[in-house]
């Protein structure tokens, strides 16, 4: 065995091979080669400095020394001497030799032959010194003459072919003592050891990342600064590394001879075109012997094989997670550091992986290479096309062994399996809530942090999920991509379309086992079940009131805090619920989408239309168990029940008067404040209640939509019509328990009761006199003001017969 030389431990790359390496791999190669040379010099083995080392020290491309030899070669022709030593062209059978000759078929020189004894293109020794146009043979440096029978790969040097043979034997004799990883070649082990031994002495001041070479940190700093000093003279494109510019120039000037017939995309290598075609067709030639999974590229199969032995030597120091590849660990670390080195030049968005940036760029270019043969729809990713194809086949290959449910995608099956195990490994440190997926936990954490990274460019509104931003954007564009095939109605969300479809089929698949009531949606059934159990797990810490839903508790808390987060941009009025704001906005727009088919009356809310329809049908499904009285609304029945209990939970702090309903208390408080916030635009008259203003407005329009079928008399309010009808029926449902007197209206009964109780709640501020009716107080106040709207005889009538006054009013 001869003495060890640098070329015994060196690895050489041709231009094509060098371009396949990424920046990190190229830098690692430079560092290893330079270190190997320094070690040989230290041992006194290396004598002269190889061209490769000189090239690497000057930060030039390592394939340049090889290129110099290529430059001197000219197209070969047949040698005029020693013709008998060369094979005739028609007798050449070796595929690589034929390929070598084909490279020069466009030359003017013909009859290029190969030397017999070498079975390869060789140099003619006789004419080494005297070249002329027709007396040259192809030099050995111009071809790859060493062939390997397993993969028909060719090499410039015999030593390189021997190294390549080792990769096919699958023997990995060189083992790392640190992590146990094995390699088939000693230089590869030497490269690997650097990961464990080398000290990162060069640190970036910006992000704190450390490097083992000053040249690498110089390049890294350009990521932070955004500096791109290398400009292409042809197209003006700039780069942060010279190697990137060199690669770009090759691709810019190089002929792309290999064109895809399907999509028209061109490539400078036939091998890349072949790989591209395989991706388009979906063929997967490379199959795993362990699990039978197939791949369209051999490199993907090689990566996949590492899953089976379970070897994961690269461990994250932050979270302890282990990986098969150092590159995967590097990508993973960016999750902890938040580093996003790959920035889009169009919009400035940054990514932690180069592949994500490549995919993102297609948004700007609108490139969609992957087309569905069934419907013609195109996609920017092959994975999206694969998913899409399952729509046409309706095939669901992924089946759950527990319940037999099938899915189109393996990811959905994995999600489904967790429903059986109940496993929730990802826990929130703030509130302790657990989740099935880390992505769901990440989204949940934003509730605590308040982070909203997704911002609308039109109105500036921010969201904590990208899907919410996408849905929100449709408000500005008015896009409604989800259309109902039955009635043509369109929706901005697929979930809304799914709900809408149930209107047409009238199917209610979710049935309550307790009472048999059926529902269209599972969420409604869940809500309904609580009515049977009476469970109210969500309790208010302020007042102790309990609720059966967390959302209702959240809304309730706003009563105590006074928070009204939903504000109207038109008038500034604020609301505690977004639904109330939506309803309120219709006042300004005048929108009334919900129209009654019977009488043509329109409403701003569907619930109001549903209630209104019961007037025509006469349906009163809600019946009081105490007195048998029926109502067309459940809320009206609830209010009615309080009459029987005499419970008055809502008390006025000013005068101590109690009320059955909070709305009545609110109205009552206005008596004390004297506030009249609702003003008529026609005559300027102000009112305490919005309902009173609405009734007043009808005076100006003269509209009386409510007509009595018996006598034809019309009214401007439905309540007045109901009261009027009692004249015809003679009905007096409201009876006094003290004296037995009956009344048509509950208000008359309440006024009458004050005769027995002697209650006089309406007091004059001037003289202190009290009255049992508000109208009497109003009449009395005119004595102090001197106002005389009525003649003395009229006043006498009013005072002696309050019922008559009531009728006049």
From Swiss-Prot:
A zinc finger (C2H2-type) spans 174-196, 202-224, 230-252, 258-280, 286-308, 314-336, 342-364, 370-392, 398-420, 426-448, 454-476, 482-504, 510-532, 538-560, 566-588, 594-616, 622-644, 650-672, 678-700, 706-728, 734-756, 762-784. GO terms for cellular component: nucleus. Its main location: nucleus. Residues 7-75 form the KRAB domain. SUPFAM superfamilies: beta-beta-alpha zinc fingers, KRAB domain (Kruppel-associated box). InterPro entries: C2H2-ZF_domain, KRAB, KRAB_dom_sf, Znf_C2H2_sf, Znf_C2H2_type. T- and B-cell lines. GO terms for molecular function: DNA binding; zinc ion binding. One of its GO terms (biological process) is regulation of transcription by RNA polymerase II. The keyword Zinc-finger applies. Changing residue 244 to C: In a colorectal cancer sample; somatic mutation. It is found in: Nucleus. Disulfide bonds: none annotated. Pfam families: KRAB, zf-C2H2, zf-C2H2_6. Keywords: DNA-binding, Metal-binding, Nucleus, Repeat, Transcription, Transcription regulation, Zinc, Zinc-finger. SMART domains: KRAB (SM00349), ZnF_C2H2 (SM00355). It comes from the Eukaryota. May be involved in transcriptional regulation. Belongs to the krueppel C2H2-type zinc-finger protein family. This is Zinc finger protein 43.
């Amino acid at each position: 065995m001869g003495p060890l030389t640098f070329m015994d431990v060196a690895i050489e790359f041709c231009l094509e091979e060098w371009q396949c390496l990424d920046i990190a791999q190229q830098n690692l190669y430079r560092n290893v080669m330079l270190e190997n040379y320094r070690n040989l010099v230290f041992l006194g083995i290396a004598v002269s400095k190889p061209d490769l080392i000189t090239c690497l020290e000057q930060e030039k491309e390592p394939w340049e020394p090889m290129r110099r030899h290529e430059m001197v070669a000219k197209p070969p022709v047949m040698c005029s001497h020693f013709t008998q030593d060369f094979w005739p062209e028609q007798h050449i059978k070796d595929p690589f030799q034929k390929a070598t000759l084909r490279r020069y078929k466009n030359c003017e020189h013909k009859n290029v032959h190969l030397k017999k004894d070498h079975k390869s293109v060789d140099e003619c020794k006789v004419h080494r010194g005297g070249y002329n146009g027709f007396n040259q043979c192809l030099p050995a440096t111009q071809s790859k003459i060493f062939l390997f029978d397993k993969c028909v790969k060719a090499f410039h040097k015999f030593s390189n072919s021997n190294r390549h043979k080792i990769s096919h034997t699958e023997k990995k004799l060189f083992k790392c003592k640190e992590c146990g990883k094995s390699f088939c070649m000693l230089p590869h082990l030497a490269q690997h050891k650097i990961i464990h031994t080398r000290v990162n002495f060069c640190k970036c001041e910006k992000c704190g990342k450390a490097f083992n070479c000053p040249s690498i940190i110089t390049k890294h700093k350009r990521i932070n600064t955004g500096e791109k000093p290398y400009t292409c003279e042809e197209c003006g494109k700039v780069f942060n590394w010279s190697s990137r510019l060199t690669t770009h120039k090759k691709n810019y000037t190089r002929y792309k001879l290999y064109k895809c017939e399907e999509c028209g995309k061109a490539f400078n290598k036939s091998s890349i075109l072949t790989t591209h075609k395989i991706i388009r067709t979906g063929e997967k030639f490379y199959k795993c012997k362990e699990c039978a999974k197939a791949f369209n590229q051999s490199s993907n199969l090689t990566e996949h094989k590492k899953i089976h032995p379970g070897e994961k030597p690269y461990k994250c120091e932050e979270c302890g997670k282990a990986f098969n590849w150092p590159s995967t660990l590097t990508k993973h670390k960016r999750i902890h550091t938040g580093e996003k080195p790959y920035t889009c030049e169009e919009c400035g968005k940054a990514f932690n992986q180069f592949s994500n940036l490549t995919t993102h760029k297609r948004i700007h270019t609108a490139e969609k290479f992957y087309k569905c043969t069934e419907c013609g729809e195109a996609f920017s990713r092959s994975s999206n096309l694969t998913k899409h194809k399952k729509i046409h086949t309706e095939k669901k290959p992924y089946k759950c062994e527990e319940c037999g449910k099938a899915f189109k995608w393996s990811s959905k099956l994995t999600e489904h399996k967790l429903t059986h195990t109940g496993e929730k490994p990802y826990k929130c440190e703030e509130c302790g809530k657990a989740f099935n997926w880390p992505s769901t936990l990440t989204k949940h954490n934003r509730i605590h942090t308040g982070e909203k990274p997704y911002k609308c460019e039109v109105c500036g509104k921010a969201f904590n999920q990208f899907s919410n931003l996408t849905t929100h954007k449709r408000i500005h564009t008015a896009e409604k991509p989800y259309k109902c095939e039955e009635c043509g109605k369109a929706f901005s969300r697929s979930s809304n379309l799914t709900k809408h479809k149930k209107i047409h089929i009238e199917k209610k698949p979710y049935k309550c086992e307790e009472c048999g009531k059926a529902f269209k949606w599972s969420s409604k059934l869940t809500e309904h079940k609580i009515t049977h159990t009476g469970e109210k797990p969500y309790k208010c810490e302020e007042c102790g009131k309990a609720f059966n839903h967390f959302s209702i508790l959240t809304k309730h808390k706003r009563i105590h805090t006074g928070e009204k987060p939903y504000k109207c941009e038109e008038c500034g009025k604020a609301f505690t619920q977004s639904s109330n704001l939506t309803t309120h906005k219709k006042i300004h727009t005048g929108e009334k989408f919900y129209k009654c088919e019977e009488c043509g009356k329109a409403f701003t809310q569907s619930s109001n239309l549903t209630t209104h329809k019961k007037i025509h049908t006469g349906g009163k499904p809600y019946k009081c168990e105490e007195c048998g009285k029926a109502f067309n609304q459940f809320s009206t029945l609830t209010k009615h029940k309080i009459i029987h209990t005499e419970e008055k939970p809502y008390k006025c702090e000013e005068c101590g008067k109690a009320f059955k309903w909070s709305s009545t208390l609110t109205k009552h408080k206005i008596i004390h404040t004297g506030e009249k916030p609702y003003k008529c635009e026609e005559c300027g008259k102000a009112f305490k209640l919005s309902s009173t203003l609405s009734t007043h407005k009808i005076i100006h329009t003269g509209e009386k939509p409510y007509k009595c079928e018996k006598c034809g008399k019309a009214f401007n309010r439905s309540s007045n019509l109901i009261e009027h009808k009692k004249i015809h029926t003679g009905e007096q449902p409201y009876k006094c328990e003290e004296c037995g007197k009956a009344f048509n209206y509950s208000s008359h009964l309440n006024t009458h009761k004050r005769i027995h109780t002697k209650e006089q709640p309406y007091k004059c501020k001037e003289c202190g006199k009290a009255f049992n009716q508000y109208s009497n107080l109003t009449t009395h106040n005119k004595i102090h003001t001197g106002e005389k709207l009525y003649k003395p005889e009229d006043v006498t009538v009013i005072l002696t017969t309050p019922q008559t006054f009531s009728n006049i009013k």
